[in-house]
Design a protein with these regions (language model features):
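Ubiquitin-like/PB1-type beta-grasp interaction modules and other compact soluble beta-rich domains
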Residues: 1-99
Length: 99
């Protein structure tokens, strides 16, 4: 399966060797967001899943996954189905406040 992956955080792009690009086609086995994350290697030999998913299989607090640019994946929805050609955007929350 292939999806369009966009990574909007320069630090994450560097970790996976994407310096100079922010979007690419990713091929992977399986059919869930977790499978996509498991297919992305990082510079230290882990996968993106290893790096950003906690032992209870939820995302770390500052990771954000946007599916098809219409749905923000909740921390416990890594089994959300993806289809060939879908777009996944990976973001990091920026601390700050308003109000």
């Amino acid at each position: 399966m292939e999806i369009q992956l966009s990574i909007q955080c320069p630090t994450i792009r560097k970790e996976i060797g994407w310096e100079g690009k922010s979007e690419d086609v990713v091929r992977f086995e399986g059919g869930t967001i977790a499978d996509v994350l498991k297919s992305i290697p990082t510079s230290n030999g882990e996968t993106f899943y290893d790096r950003f998913i906690r032992d209870d299989h939820t995302m770390i607090a500052n990771a954000v996954i946007w599916h098809n640019v219409v749905y923000f994946v909740q921390r416990d929805e890594l089994d959300r189905k993806v289809n060939d050609g879908d777009k996944i955007v990976l973001l990091r929350r920026i601390p700050g406040g308003g109000g």
